[in-house]
């Protein structure tokens, strides 16, 4: 994978695909690396938009193939990290497409670097101005508690030796509602399939990055609310599309509805029964979501 050095930050892994005059930056969610887009989203985007757009995927510092993160989490800083990457790659103006945390980073990029954003789309959209943000993000306390039980692994990158331990402790309780040791045999089989499906999207991420991000969600995510409150209403001339599944329990659809009220030019499309991560891994959920984005992008030509 290509890697570029960003002064004062470290190294960032990235990948180009597609062809065309425009550039769409795919911004990852949570602690997933850029392969998060490969299973379902990227094939649809390439098929529908190739010849019109190139796609830039990248790993945040601390994630995937990038170097370890040494600075505290801050969404505006992550937007600046993307700006630095674009500068290093000699890319000027872009279309932003972020999922989950990637939507927050995209929103921050709009605020800080409006002149470089041609359009914005978010899938599963955290709203840091929501009065229901704290109870929504409280789920990360359980995940952080689980990580505290494996502190000896924090300095490591996720690899095949530690992967099952991390996922079984952190994500299995969130998905199945109980500890891995309490799963039935069929549930353990489902957990195994899930681990195999998402390993490539988590490989290389520092476990310390997971710890720091979950702490940020619990204690620091609202610190930048002032910048969002002041900046987002000024984005009236930026084409925007907000996508959200009605079955999304991580970034509930009410957050996208609230953002749509704040951003009257944004179009909100809700997908019945679609979950938070379903579009990234399940073809049935991915197809309507990403085809709708392609329709939006054809309107930007």
What is the predicted function of each stretch?
Residues 120-159:
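Flexible "cap/lid" loop of the alpha/beta hydrolase fold
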Residues 92-135:
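Conserved hydrolase catalytic core segment
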Residues 247-251:
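Acidic catalytic loop of the alpha/beta-hydrolase fold
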Residues 57-97:
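Active-site loop/oxyanion-hole signature of alpha/beta-hydrolase fold enzymes
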Residues 274-287:
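Catalytic histidine-centered segment of alpha/beta-hydrolase-like enzymes
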Residues 157-216, 221-226, 231-234:
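Conserved alpha/beta-hydrolase catalytic His-Asp/Glu region
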Residues 235-236, 242-244:
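Short beta-strand/loop motif that positions the catalytic acidic residue
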Residues 10-67:
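Conserved HGGG/HGGXW glycine-rich cap/lid loop of the alpha/beta-hydrolase fold
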């Amino acid at each position: 994978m290509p890697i570029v050095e960003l002064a004062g930050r470290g190294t960032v892994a990235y990948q180009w695909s597609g062809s065309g005059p425009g550039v769409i930056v795919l911004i990852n969610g949570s602690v997933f690396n850029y392969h998060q887009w490969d299973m379902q989203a990227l094939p649809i985007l390439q098929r529908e938009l190739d010849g019109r757009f190139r796609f830039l995927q990248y790993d945040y510092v601390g994630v995937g193939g990038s170097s370890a993160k040494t600075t505290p989490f801050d969404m505006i800083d992550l937007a600046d990290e993307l700006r630095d990457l674009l500068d290093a790659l000699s890319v000027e103006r872009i279309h932003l497409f972020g999922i989950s945390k990637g939507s927050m980073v995209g929103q921050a990029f709009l605020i800080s670097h409006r002149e470089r954003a041609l359009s914005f789309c978010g899938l599963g959209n955290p709203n840091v101005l929501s009065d229901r943000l704290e109870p929504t993000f409280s789920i990360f306390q359980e995940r952080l508690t689980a990580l505290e039980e494996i502190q000896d692994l924090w300095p490591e990158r996720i690899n095949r030796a530690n992967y099952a331990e991390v996922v079984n402790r952190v994500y299995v309780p969130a998905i199945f509602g109980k500890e891995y040791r309490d799963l039935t045999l069929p549930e353990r089989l489902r957990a195994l399939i899930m681990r195999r499906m998402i390993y490539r999207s988590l490989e290389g991420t520092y476990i310390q990055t997971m710890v720091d991000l979950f702490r940020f969600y619990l204690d620091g995510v609202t610190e930048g609310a002032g910048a969002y409150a002041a900046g987002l209403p000024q984005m009236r001339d930026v084409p925007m599309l907000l996508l959200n599944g009605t079955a999304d329990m991580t970034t509930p659809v009410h957050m996208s509805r609230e953002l749509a009220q704040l951003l009257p030019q944004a179009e909100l499309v809700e997908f019945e029964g679609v979950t938070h991560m379903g579009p990234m891994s399940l073809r049935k959920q991915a197809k309507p979501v990403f085809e709708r984005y392609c329709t939006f992008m054809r309107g930007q030509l």
